Each structure stands twice: as C-alpha cells, then as structure tokens.
C-alpha cells in the first residue's frame, strides 16, 4: 500500500454509486459493553444475521478483535464470510472504513478520512478512537489498495451518498457541525469532497433524522436509489419532531438539480415508531465515562433508509413495527430488480445505527 499525495480526482478516480457491482462487503464485529447491551451478545447475533443475508449475494469480510476472533468465526459459519483479526474501538465500518474509489481502467483505491468518533471532545460518542481511525488503513493494506489520507479533515462515510454520476447528497447538520471541521467553510468542505470523490454537484439537506447521535447522517434519512431518484424518510404527523426536517428536506430536493441537470424524483418511506429502548435494554449497557448515555426516554433514530444495496439485493432493517410491511413494499417497488431481504435491526439501532452504518461496500474494479 502506498499513501498518495495526489487526490482521486487528479488521478481519474471517483466514488461509484452503491448499486455498482461489488467485490465484497466489509463489517466489524461488535464487542464494547458500554455501547452494546449484555456484553454485545444480542448485537453479535444481529450482526451475524446481517452478514449471512449479505453473503447470499456477495462475499463478506468481518474484522474481529483477537479476543472475539474465535467467537466471531463460530457465529459466522458461512463459506462466503471471511473473518480477519483486527483491533478497533467499535463496529461502525461505514464511518471508520475506507471510501473506495475506482477509475475506468480497473483501478481500485481508498480514501481514508480522519475519524473523531462523531465529534471528538465536543460531543464525540466515546474516547479514545485511535484504533478506529486506523481501520481504513488496515483494510486498504489487506486489499493492497493505495490510499488517500485526508489528515485533519474529518468525515464519516455515513454522512454522504453519491449517485456515481457526479452528484453527492449530505446534511448541513453533520458536515457543517463545529465538531467536525470548524476551521473550514462550506466552500472549503465542498472542495475536499469534489477532489476526493470526483463529484460536481452537492445537495445540502438542512438536517438528518431527529435525535440521530451522529449529528444527522444522511444515510439514515435520504439516499439515491438510481440516478435522478432519491428515497426520503417521511412522516405526515405534524407533531412528530421529524416533520419539519422532512418538509425542509423535501423543499431542497424539489428545487435541486443533479450534476446532469435532472430534477429529482423523490420517493417517500415512512419513519417507524416512535421507537425507544426499554429499561431492561438500557440496563444491559455498562456505563463508562466518555460513552454515550442510554436512556429509555430518548427516542431512537430508527429508519428504513438505513439499508445496504448489494449485488442483486437490498438488505434492510425491520423493527417489529407495524410499518415494517409497508417499508418492505416500498423497497420492492423502488428496487424491482433486487431481492429485498428484511433483517431484524432493533439490536443494531440500540447501539446507535443500522445496517448501512455497519457495512462498507468494496466496488468491483472494471475496465470501461
């Protein structure tokens, strides 16, 4: 692995859309007791179910600590799931792993963003996060991929979505938050995104979902489903704190034009719940200094948008909610050529995210 001093755009590389063919998906095995209840056993079962669902469509590599390696290997009993030993601080590989970029000549490289646990000393969710900031480099070394390191520029993979044709969508709530890159203006942040993802048009939604502890990651709220079309989490309940957020996002999306000059088609998918952790679920989390508080009174940021597109499939969360069926129907309508697989997502949600947050796709290189 070589750490390059150029940028992907200078070298002809770009971030492809999630629906482009994958060579595999990456995950990290959960274990920290101050985030995952009951010593992470329920979360590990949930992660294993997600990995096995993905493995129906493409290979999966799961990174597990030395302490957890044998347990992970036993739980992930599928020939298409590889387990590698890797230290980390937590299991959110969407945010700690590399953003892979490709060119039109069979090349594959990775962008290694600086990671600060969603806010560092100003609202970050745990300390220390040094091992998580090294996950992207370790994955790139395993894959013999050259690396672009954005030293000092903080970004998580869950805060961006691209259409593969030059358009990126994100939220002001996250990328303009003072706990990410306070030294940079919006224009300077856009310049980094344009250079490292080779995008030309950036759509800024004001907010993500209410109470999203990542400061409003877009991957829990709105995503591209194909060029010119997005899927937006939605509520018609004016008393829901997400109502104003949905309305504001819709106003932006209706005015927006993508990099090809297209107006966007916006599909809506309902927001489940309101969902809350139970007293018992919160009691199973070990309270440690510097970690995120788990409280039954705090609404969970549940979302059906937090799914992963894989080769021929959609791996989406179900919550045991009355809206699960409607969400599955909408996903089947929006992705008619994909097999929609709903996987229990509550345990992942209790830790602060969902299926898209715990996965990172590795695109398959190709020659145009």
UniProtKB/Swiss-Prot annotation:
Gene: aguA
Pfam family, one: PAD_porph
Gene Ontology terms for molecular function: agmatine deiminase activity; protein-arginine deiminase activity
Entry's EC annotation: 3.5.3.12
Originating organism: Stutzerimonas stutzeri (strain A1501)
Enzyme superclass (EC): hydrolase
Subunit and partners: Homodimer.
Protein name: Agmatine deiminase
InterPro entries: Agmatine_deiminase, Peptidyl-Arg-deiminase_porph
Pathway(s) annotated for this protein in UniProt: Amine and polyamine biosynthesis; putrescine biosynthesis via agmatine pathway; N-carbamoylputrescine from agmatine: step 1/1
Active site, per annotation: 357 (amidino-cysteine intermediate)
């Amino acid at each position: 692995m070589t750490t390059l001093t150029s940028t992907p755009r200078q070298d002809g590389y770009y971030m492809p859309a999630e629906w482009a063919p994958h060579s595999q998906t990456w995950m990290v095995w959960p274990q920290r007791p101050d985030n995952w209840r009951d010593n992470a056993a329920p979360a590990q079962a949930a992660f294993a179910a997600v990995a096995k669902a993905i493995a129906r469509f493409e290979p999966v590599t799961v990174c597990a600590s030395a302490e957890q390696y044998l347990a992970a290997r036993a739980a992930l009993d599928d020939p298409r799931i590889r387990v590698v030993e890797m230290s980390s601080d937590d299991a959110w590989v969407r945010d700690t792993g590399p953003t892979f970029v490709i060119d039109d000549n069979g090349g594959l490289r990775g962008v290694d963003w600086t990671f600060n646990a969603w806010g560092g000393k100003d609202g970050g969710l745990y300390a220390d996060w040094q091992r998580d900031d090294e996950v992207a480099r370790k994955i790139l070394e395993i894959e013999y991929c050259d690396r672009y390191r954005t030293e000092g520029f903080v970004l998580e993979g869950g805060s961006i979505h691209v259409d593969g044709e030059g358009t990126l969508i994100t939220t002001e709530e996250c990328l303009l938050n003072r706990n990410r890159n306070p030294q940079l203006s919006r224009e300077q942040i856009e310049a980094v995104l344009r250079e490292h993802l080779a995008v030309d048009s950036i759509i800024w939604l004001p907010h993500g979902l209410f109470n999203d502890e990542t400061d409003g990651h877009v991957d829990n709220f709105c995503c591209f489903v194909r060029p010119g079309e997005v899927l937006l989490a939605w509520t018609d309940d004016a008393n829901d704190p997400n109502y104003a957020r949905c309305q504001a996002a819709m106003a932006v999306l209706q005015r927006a034009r993508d990099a090809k000059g297209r107006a966007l088609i916006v599909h809506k998918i309902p927001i489940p719940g309101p969902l809350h952790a139970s007293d018992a679920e919160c009691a199973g989390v070990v309270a440690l200094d510097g970690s995120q508080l788990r409280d039954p009174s705090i609404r969970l940021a549940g979302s059906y948008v937090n799914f992963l597109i894989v080769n021929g499939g959609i791996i989406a969360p179900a919550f045991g909610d009355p809206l699960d069926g409607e969400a599955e129907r909408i996903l089947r309508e929006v992705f008619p050529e994909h097999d929609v697989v709903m996987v229990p997502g509550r345990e992942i949600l209790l830790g602060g995210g969902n299926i898209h947050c715990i996965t990172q796709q590795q695109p398959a290189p190709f020659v145009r």
